[in-house]
Amino acid sequence: MLLGGGLAVAERLWQQPVRRWFMVLMMIPIFLPPVVVTTSFIATFGTQGIFPLKILYSPVAVVLAYCYYNIPLAYLLLRSAVSRISPATEAAAQLLGANRWQRLTTVLLPQLWIPLLGTAGLIFLYSFTSFILPLQLGSIHGYTLEVWLYQRIYLYHTYGIAMIAALIQLSIIGSVLFIIGRFLRAIMISTVTPEQFGRTQFSFKLISVVYASLIMLPLIGFVVKILSHSTSDDVMTLLNSHFISSLLRTVLVTMLVIFLTTSLVFIGRFGTKGALLLLALSPVTVSFVWYQWFGQGYVSLIGALLMTTLPISMILIQHARQQYAKFFLDTARLLGASWWQRILLEVQLLQPTMRQIVVFGGILVIGDATISSALTPTAQPLAMPYATQLIGSYRFGVGSLALLAILLLIILLSTFSYARRP
């Protein structure tokens, strides 16, 4: 909050314009699967890494990985919230003789406390329910409740104590969501007030370069590690393994989950409460519920993945429907439009949001390693768990190439979806 949100507020106080390249770079960690982040940290900061800092497999590494995700998230959310504040209010305060500190305390903060609380709540929820980051970077010293819960379910099969822990976790997450539920709309990206600011000061340019360098450093280390240590034998091993078939299964499962998600959110009229209810379930809890109901298999896998893609999709579609007036479709009906014509009209209105759902849903499914590793049949794994197994079996070169292929698939999905904008 301090490093990400503080930069967003400081840019407004010093009237710095939005830098498109910086916004794009700050979005990169949000779209990265956790396994890619942990592997990048190992390749860059591990004992055999480019910068062997000897911080891995400790709580410090877990905290740094959380910061890698959440500092950009805080910046983007609060930058959006700040941009919705009219510059005229600050200009009026400045004309009345208010300095920057007074403008911060009397103009900005009173209008930002709701986005601040909402952003803090989301960061807490993400860190509290994270599984892959503490599992791969924390070792036994950095295990969290989510990792402990996973071990009790799938390693020790102590379902009774696992259910009690899951209920405690659910009550904590539910309480946080109940508190920040009314703040979600305030932190969603929407129409902003245009900012007519001048050129960026050198100090903010320098800060932007530092932030961008810290974001790109693990990824660059990951790529350098692949190029320097992967051989042609690794490529042939990957091609002759089950990775290609697992990648094809991942694509098919992703297409099915996205189709079901878009159909459900378009046909249904889900409210924010339904989305919050699903958000209260952590990935390990979701997989545990489906594992108990239907066992291990693709029915459980697709059902659990739907429960992870539906919340963000429900929030996005509800927000989009609020952007156009309800009487718009009523007018079309009064003018004689058939049911099918009204459906096509709403599809046209919601087309940008549908593309966002495809991108977010695809990234969640392709990048998932928690649910898919627990529910996918052992003989038919998906791509991400398979790549994780390769890395865990000390075949780093082959596993890194598999992760790179998955990352390219995510980039292709995002590029294709947004390139179709009219």
Language model feature labels by segment:
Residues P87, Q102, I140-E146, S175-S203, ...:
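Feature of multi-pass inner-membrane transport and sensor proteins
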Residues L96-A98, P110, L335-A337:
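Glycine/proline-centered hinge or cleavage motifs at structural transition points of membrane proteins
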Residues I85-T89, E195, Y324-F328:
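Short glycine/proline-centered loop/turn elements that form peptide/ligand docking sites
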Residues M1-S83, Q111-G138, I164-G181, Q201-S228, ...:
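Membrane-water interface segments at the C-terminal ends of transmembrane alpha-helices
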Residues I132-H157, A369-F396:
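Glycine-rich helix-loop "coupling/hinge" segments at transmembrane-helix boundaries
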Residues I28, A91-Q94, A162, H319, ...:
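Short hydrophobic faces within alpha-helices
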Residues L95, Y418-P422:
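Short, charged juxtamembrane terminal tails flanking transmembrane helices
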Residues L53-I55, W148-I161, V235-S245, Q389-Y394:
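Membrane-interface segments at the starts/ends of alpha-helical transmembrane spans
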